[in-house]
């Protein structure tokens, strides 16, 4: 008997389910369109071809087109790293049009790393300079410097792309171009992590949870990347455990302290951002790295979110089980203190991450630390471990999903009618405020949307790096700095038929390496003898030809957890942003385990909320598992 028949017999398609689907379908539809808006807006803010940033050099990520009240027409190392990491993940999942943007960014950072600035030069602290002019020159005005999260985040972004290159056999590009740049940033992190600097909001000069968390991640994955390119990072290996040891000191017993050396309460979305940007899909609910589903991170989520409930008029009358608009920290006075789009989206994203982790491990645990978080959403919550097969688990997961979606719905409500996202929205009337078209806001939308759809990045190695010494030590280590000039990208990665010369100049002299490549196309497979890695996950794009009418939406459901375990309310929404009358294409890209076999179907949610299943039989698919094969496409037609 088909799954569709079973549904009919069990009576699952009822008014209650229709109401759930109605709310989800409305948000799904907006997110499908908004994701396209966000991707376009990000590219509009990247030089040299970005429509909104005339004058910015190639590959430079501009924070916002706003040049007055406030003037954000600069490039920040932190923001750029976070944005490019988002694009790298999209590229890994099949958005190959982003290739040149990522390459141009990496090339620009080779220049930026070598620019002398008020924080120093390449090997004397200059990598901690927070922002630069869009023409790749130093900004010399007064500013909160240094900011030590930037090099770590830039390293993470470049490692992500470097790993894609390695997974597809392009070892020379990863080794000769990406690794020397990453090595510089890892050297900075290892040398300066134990020194104070300004936090991500550029206001507190002290020690910041977000900074320390992303520094730990960068050194862990940096060491693994070094090994993958045939090198090593001893300074990564010696400092990562000490950084993790220090990270534990931010836990107060009930929430994560955002900054030492601050007179504030310490409740700050700095900590939510730290959790989501160190999320590892292979990790458990580990308190030591404050994984999104960990008791500490969930308790902190409640404390931070609740700190905004009473201070914004927008949040009046909302219960503890309802999402609210979220700002940076409750004492904020910038623009009179308002909710931020990226902060509100971070609150949602942490919960989507947690849902993914619970689903993967097949259970959730409630401890004394996290009990208040769960009780606010499910009054019957009690300490214990609940299997995914239990009714309590299902009820809690449903409540958390609804809570998470509530934050995204707030963003939908206050986004401009054309989808534009500024930095902030007014705490009283919800109107957009501060810098327009903030690049980070758009990146936050894309990452939250991906996590909502169970599209996750690769592991960064948390499971092998979650222990620390018995006694913390104030240490540092010296690495290797070298200037890098990228004259062009190899044809196997870029446009074909080019010659690449990467020149690396270190403190001990000059080492030049040249590579001539004759591969004809960026889509061809390298024929070199370089070893090739078999990916553990594959980005599978489902292309469906289906003629629809206005108000209808298409979802993908299937027999595995990534496709909702046949639950229609957990189906994956397809996008129609490429739909035309001559080519009615719906599509979605989902990251699935390599070698996984499963059954699936598409469903159509009508404008009246009714659900229509495809005709039988169930479709079947096995995810490829082969050397260098990290993407795949399935082409179907509605039946």
From Swiss-Prot:
Positions contributing to substrate binding: 143
Transmembrane segments: none
Domain of life according to the entry: Eukaryota
Extent of the signal sequence: 1-18
Catalytic activities: Hydrolysis of terminal (1->4)-linked alpha-D-glucose residues successively from non-reducing ends of the chains with release of beta-D-glucose
Organism: Aspergillus kawachii (White koji mold)
SUPFAM superfamilies associated with the record: Six-hairpin glycosidases, Starch-binding domain-like
Region span, Raw-starch-adsorbable GP-I sequence: 494-531
Gene that encodes the chain: gaI
CDD domains associated with the record: CBM20_glucoamylase
Lineage of source species: Eukaryota, Fungi, Dikarya, Ascomycota, Pezizomycotina
Classification via Gene3D superfamilies: 1.50.10.10, Immunoglobulins
Protein name: Glucoamylase I
Family named by the database record: Belongs to the glycosyl hydrolase 15 family.
